């Protein structure tokens, strides 16, 4: 693995680090379409997957399956439209399906429909953000977001579309208008 804080590097440096790491994995046989296929996770995105793909293609130009050496890449690198939000959509669709089965809802000691629930999301990265957006944009109420640097809470609900705009400009969810900051975000998981 590679353990770095991507916030401490500029884009050019991150690209060099990522490609060098990828080349070493490729040379050692740990990364290929048939062996191990990286996907975006914490601290990585479509951008890094594109860099890894570029590194793979430069070392294995004759591999006709080179595009399959990573998943989660951008459409212009051979990725699939909708991939970015797919996991978050899956969370939303799973919740919808769960609430269609009243017997299962009752067994879980929950009442009402999905839109009757007050929901707290853990994480505001790709999965958390897109889960929250699908839930909110379909009538659900998100009352809290727990993130690594703290959380936010509003018992009446948070406008996820406005929060996303805020997060993209501030690089944090903290101090979002009309919410309370929660220092220890894990405490949020017990709020109602």
Task: Cite the ranges covered by each PLM segment.
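Glycine/serine-rich phosphate-binding loop and adjoining beta1-alpha1 elements at the start
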Residues: 1-115
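Glycine-rich phosphate/diphosphate-binding loop of Rossmann-like nucleotide-binding domains
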Residues: 78-191
């Amino acid at each position: 693995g590679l353990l770095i804080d991507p916030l401490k590097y500029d884009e050019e440096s991150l690209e060099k680090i990522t490609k060098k790491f990828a080349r070493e994995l490729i040379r050692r046989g740990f990364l290929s379409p048939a062996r191990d296929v990286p996907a975006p996770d914490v601290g990585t995105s479509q951008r890094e997957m594109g860099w890894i793909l570029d590194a793979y293609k430069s070392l294995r130009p004759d591999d006709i399956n080179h595009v399959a050496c990573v998943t989660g890449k951008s459409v212009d690198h051979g990725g699939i439209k909708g991939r970015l939000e797919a996991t978050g959509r899956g969370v939303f669709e799973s919740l919808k399906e769960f609430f269609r089965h009243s017997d299962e809802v009752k067994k879980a000691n929950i009442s009402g429909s999905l839109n009757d629930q007050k929901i707290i999301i853990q994480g505001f990265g790709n999965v958390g953000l897109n889960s929250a957006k699908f839930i909110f944009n379909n009538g659900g109420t998100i009352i809290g977001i727990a993130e690594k640097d703290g959380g936010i809470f509003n018992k009446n609900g948070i406008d996820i579309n406005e929060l996303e705009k805020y997060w993209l400009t501030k690089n944090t969810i903290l101090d979002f208008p009309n919410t309370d900051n929660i220092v220890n975000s894990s405490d949020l998981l017990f709020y109602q």
